[in-house]
């Protein structure tokens, strides 16, 4: 996969999770602080993943992208689970 495509995928997934948090913040006004922390975590994760993708390790490129995809989907799954628990 191209870096451009991976950046778009990362932005899309993080955007969807962020949108879910916005919806949850309107539904659960009593859990606003937890939701704000989750939104900050999503933005920090997105920034970290995009920075990693912008500076690819020169040695093992295939391994780098494989690890990147694993980390991306692991973060997405973890955050989605946290949203469901609210």
Description of each model-found segment:
Residues 1-30:
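N-terminal acidic leader/helix
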């Amino acid at each position: 996969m191209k870096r451009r495509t991976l950046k778009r995928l990362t932005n899309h997934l993080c955007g969807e999770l962020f949108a879910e948090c916005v919806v949850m913040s309107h539904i659960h006004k009593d859990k606003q602080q937890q939701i704000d922390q989750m939104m900050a975590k999503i933005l920090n994760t997105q920034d970290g993943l995009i920075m990693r993708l912008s500076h690819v390790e020169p040695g093992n490129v295939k391994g780098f992208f494989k690890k990147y995809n694993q980390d991306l989907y692991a973060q997405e799954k973890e955050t989605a689970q946290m949203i469901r628990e609210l």
